[in-house]
């Protein structure tokens, strides 16, 4: 199938509200990723909201929209992203085989986290929150790529009011979202999701809460203390537990997290060079 200057080559995701294809730019012959939104299953306003934020972001660690095409005849919107070669999501990174004594791998993971923090910091500085930070939405090749802004909000944009409710991926959603309170600081919930992502990476794919049922998971996150992080690096574990503190006001700022990670990266770098 060909529309405009793009062809659809391979379906990689099929959901009610959207389908995602690997495609080709027929002019440059470059691979692209194409999201197809259907107006029948999602309002045009909602689709425009989804593409607004990635279209205005400009950061080396954030995936940016390449193009979009509206097909009035079929009531579909085609959103085109660059295809990133040789990527792996953080979810598929084999951290369960991670040896805590391997300083090179530790340095690599900390460097990944610093790049993620850089992307979040840039977004927050521009009053944008991601709202679905998790290993699946972080891709790696030679650098980090934060993706999937379908749930993101711009905090100061009256055209697209901030969405309320339990939005996100359950295991990575902050307690205050489950509490269903009126006033939520969504920058703080992004920070919490970052903390759970760090916990996952540094605890061999384990998470601080475990439940078989959605309702049980909701209750645990809302009411129970998280299982203590045990990465083998007490300073990192202490930072992770602060980031996933149940009280949003006790969580460090994104700049404080970056400072701590850079400090730890310097220490690891010194040890690596010393051992050489």
From Swiss-Prot:
Pfam families: Pkinase (PF00069). One of its GO terms (molecular function) is protein serine/threonine kinase activity. It is an enzyme of class 2 (transferase). Residues 6-266 form the Protein kinase domain. InterPro entries: Kinase-like_dom_sf (IPR011009), Prot_kinase_dom (IPR000719), Ser/Thr_kinase_AS (IPR008271). ATP binds at residues 12-20, 35. Keywords: ATP-binding, Kinase, Nucleotide-binding, Serine/threonine-protein kinase, Transferase. PROSITE patterns: PROTEIN_KINASE_DOM, PROTEIN_KINASE_ST. It catalyses: L-seryl-[protein] + ATP = O-phospho-L-seryl-[protein] + ADP + H(+); L-threonyl-[protein] + ATP = O-phospho-L-threonyl-[protein] + ADP + H(+). The active site is at 132 (proton acceptor). Its EC number is 2.7.11.1. Coiled coil: none annotated. Belongs to the protein kinase superfamily. Ser/Thr protein kinase family. This is Putative serine/threonine-protein kinase R436.
């Amino acid at each position: 199938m060909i529309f405009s200057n793009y062809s659809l080559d391979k379906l990689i995701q099929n959901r009610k509200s959207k389908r995602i294809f690997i495609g080709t730019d027929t002019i440059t012959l470059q691979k692209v990723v194409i999201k197809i939104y259907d107006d029948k299953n999602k309002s045009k306003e909602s689709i425009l909201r989804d593409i607004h934020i990635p279209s205005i972001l400009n950061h080396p660690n954030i995936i940016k929209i390449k193009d979009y095409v509206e097909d009035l005849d079929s009531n579909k919107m085609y959103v085109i992203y660059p295809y990133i070669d040789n990527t792996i999501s953080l979810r598929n990174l084999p951290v369960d085989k991670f040896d805590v004594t391997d300083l090179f791998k530790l340095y690599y993971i900390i460097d990944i986290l610093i790049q993620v923090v850089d992307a979040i910091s840039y977004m927050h500085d521009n009053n944008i929150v991601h709202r679905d930070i998790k290993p699946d939405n972080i891709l790696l090749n030679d650098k980090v790529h934060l993706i999937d802004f379908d749930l993101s909000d711009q905090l100061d944009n009256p055209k697209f009011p901030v969405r309320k409710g339990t939005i996100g991926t359950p295991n990575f959603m902050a307690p205050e979202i489950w509490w269903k309170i009126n006033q939520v600081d969504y920058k703080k919930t992004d920070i919490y999701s970052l903390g759970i992502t760090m916990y996952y990476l540094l605890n061999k794919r384990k998470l601080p809460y475990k439940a078989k049922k959605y309702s049980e998971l909701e209750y645990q996150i809302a009411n129970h203390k998280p299982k203590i992080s045990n990465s083998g690096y007490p300073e990192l574990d202490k930072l992770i537990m602060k980031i996933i503190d149940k009280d949003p006001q006790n969580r460090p700022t994104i700049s404080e997290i970056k400072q701590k990670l850079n400090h730890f990266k310097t220490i690891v770098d010194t040890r690596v060079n010393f051992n050489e």
